[in-house]
Amino acid sequence: MDILTLIFYSIYLMIPAYLANGSALVFGGGTPMDFGHYCWDNRRLIGNGVTWRGTVCGGLFGMVIGGILGLLATYGIGSYFFNITASQITFMSGFVPQGLLVGFLLGFGALIGDAIGSFLKRRLNFERGKPVPLLDQLDFVVVSLLFVSTVVSLSLEMIVIIILVSIFLHLGANMFAYMINLKDVWY
């Protein structure tokens, strides 16, 4: 696979993770995932920023996006890229079920990664909303890649591309969310 195709495939594969991560901000609110509990260091386990509603709705949104990508592939839209993923999932057939599975893994992986990132930030004594470069951009990426790697092979080149692209996409998305008043900070 040439480098340009690999870049496009990497972005295509991550669409459910990217959209799930962003949608948690829209769907979020309600009960914090840590239920307000504190850790051994007398700081919140995760904090108010990661909620059950945002995590569940965002994860399901990622799954739906994966299903939509699978459905579009049945009509030839993005089918080249979807076939690369689908050909590796041998225990189930059909683009839509395969898309739902990949979307589920990427979507929930992204949001669990975000929760892990929040946990780490609290342990490192960073307050909610304070920037922690690279952790802020990559927590959701790393865990979503771990989850999806259970069904899809990821080359080292692909992982590097996803990490690099994700850093810039994440910063751009945060700036946009800040401009439309969905976030209090631009980073």
Swiss-Prot record:
Keyword Lipid metabolism: yes
Keyword vocabulary terms for this entry: Cell membrane, Lipid biosynthesis, Lipid metabolism, Magnesium, Membrane, Phospholipid biosynthesis, Phospholipid metabolism, Transferase, Transmembrane, Transmembrane helix
Cofactor: Mg(2+)
Residue intervals passing through the bilayer: 7-27, 58-78, 100-120, 137-156, 167-187
One GO BP: glycerophospholipid biosynthetic process
An annotated GO cellular component: plasma membrane
Function as written in the Swiss-Prot or TrEMBL entry: Catalyzes the formation of CDP-2,3-bis-(O-geranylgeranyl)-sn-glycerol (CDP-archaeol) from 2,3-bis-(O-geranylgeranyl)-sn-glycerol 1-phosphate (DGGGP) and CTP. This reaction is the third ether-bond-formation step in the biosynthesis of archaeal membrane lipids.
PANTHER family xref list: CDP-ARCHAEOL SYNTHASE
HAMAP family with a match to the protein in the record: CDP_archaeol_synth
Name of this protein: CDP-archaeol synthase
Taxonomy of the source species: Archaea, Methanobacteriati, Methanobacteriota, Methanomada group, Methanobacteria
Gene that this sequence comes from: carS
